[in-house]
Amino acid sequence: MKKLISRRNFLKVCALAGSAAALSACGGGKSTGSNNSAAAAVDVTGAVTFPLSEKVTFTGMTSFPVGSEPEPNNRTIFKRLEEQTNVHIDWTAIQSDQWSDKITLNMSNPNTLTDFVFTADFTDSNLLRYADQGVILNLEDYIDNNMPYLQKVFEKYPEYRTMCTDSDGHIWALPWIEQLGAEKTAIQTIGNMSFINTKWLNFLGLSMPTTVDEFEQVLMAFRDNAASIKAEYGIDGDIIPMSCIVNNGDQDPSILINGFGEGYGDADKDRHIAVTNDRKVICAATQQGYRDGLDWLHKLYAEKLIDPECFTQEWSTYVSKGKAGRYGVCFSWDVANIDNLTDWEPLPALTADTRNITPQNGSFTSGFARGRCVVTAKATNPALVCAWLDQMYAPLQSPQNNWGTYGDAEGFNIFELSTNDKGEPMLKHAPLGDASPVEVREAQCVSGPLAVLDDYYGVYVTCPDDAQYRLDWIKEIYTPDMNNDYVYPNVFMSNEDTEQVSNLQADLQTYMNTQKADWIMNGTTDAEWNEYLSKLEAYGLSDYLGIMQKYLDAYYA
């Protein structure tokens, strides 16, 4: 049983660790942040009615995207929340590309610890470590007593509460939930969607490829007709038949090899696991189909059909070349982030030995992040902090936090405030025009804990256009070829197993990804493949799969 450390004991740790100054930062001394008398004086015994009669102040940490507004309280969403709740937040804001380094330091220093961490995105090992140290609070009682919006979500979808709860029955963080479709039609089933330039296809009189051989012939046509393509469309720079970023999430080309062997592909590009139809966890990166697929990608690379920068290029470089119109095939969550929608279509599943699309693990329960937001032992009135955070789960609030807002006179607005069929307030998506969905949202949204549910669409918010066309693509093009009955679910392991999996995965993932890139570039031999399998076993692959299997069995027990 996990030992729970009370706030009082945590304050003792602070005092021992850092003298009177640290104690002041943790809970006494100078009246700053949530330690003001107004916050401490609010008696919270159930749901809280906002706005509060007297303004209170909490402290919070959050991240912001590079190039966007760095001061959270300058964002319209937080301005409105302060007006609606009479709660002011003193923010510590960290640029997203510096978050992982700085959040670790801030969580270990009582002088920089805040009442809550809005965009924590902690891993399970982070959550359990901070829980054991007494730095974060278990939240299940606050959820039941002070968070009616989140409680309503859990009542409707009890699987989310299960996924938030550790093996000892505690909830250490508030989740991010985004439903867009479900099961095999969920928007998260495919991350690294492949797109093909239909303008080039039509210009060369080519058909949409449906097999790996046809695909290779199309790439060769792009390569061999580069001069005429450049002249026809006024393209500066070399024509690149296919570009990608190997081992880089949604930009990775692994979806192309899903048809080799038994058709498992490599949809889980971090853990490299898949689930068979008889509910066995396997390593996708040790299957013969995986090797055959990489051999084929090497053939394409050797034929100069793949961008030579695919192993090293940054996102900005990848996008820049795409915006210049130089790609025949590319990979991303949405091609609109790379080029435009008009000239591109999703590439269907390619038949090799079989025809299959493996959905991403965890995708059948839609978008879910267990460790999105935590409340720390610094909070003098955690029930009130939780009551304020519960406002993020209000049906009209969650879509704004997730995507953006309305009524911002100084910038582009994601939404217009409209009404639904019953005359009730509803957020209506404004046209994006030529703007990048990612860039527009980053300018307004605040992320954090939230829940956008499928039954909100048409009632509280319209479905985003870029989500709707992606949902349509998945349902029409990919779902029919999803022959797998299972994906690996989002499970919360024990502290011991989380630590062991983390340690094993560090070596396994690094080695698998290194070899994957090397074999696409240089090819492989039987001897190298056999050595690879032996090394993976030495790195603990069987133990790793055994732990994963244990939790899969428990999930379906």
Residue ranges and their predicted role:
Residues 2-6, 11-214, 226, 265-273, ...:
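Conserved N-terminal structural module of periplasmic/extracytoplasmic solute-binding proteins
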Residues 56, 62-73, 180-195, 202-208, ...:
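Extracytoplasmic/periplasmic substrate-binding proteins
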Residues 78, 104-105, 111-117, 216, ...:
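Catalytic-domain carbohydrate-binding cleft regions of carbohydrate-active enzymes
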Residues 88-94, 309, 345-347:
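General small-molecule cofactor/ligand-binding pocket signal
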Residues 138-159, 219-222, 237-266, 329-339:
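Carboxylate/His-rich catalytic cores and anion/metal-binding grooves
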Residues 140, 168-251, 275-321, 375-408, ...:
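Helix-loop-helix "hinge/cap" segment bordering the ligand-binding cleft or interdomain interface
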Residues 299-301, 318-333, 342, 351-444:
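Glycine-rich, aromatic-lined ligand/substrate-binding cores of catalytic
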Residues 387, 394-515, 523:
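Conserved small-residue motifs centered on glycine
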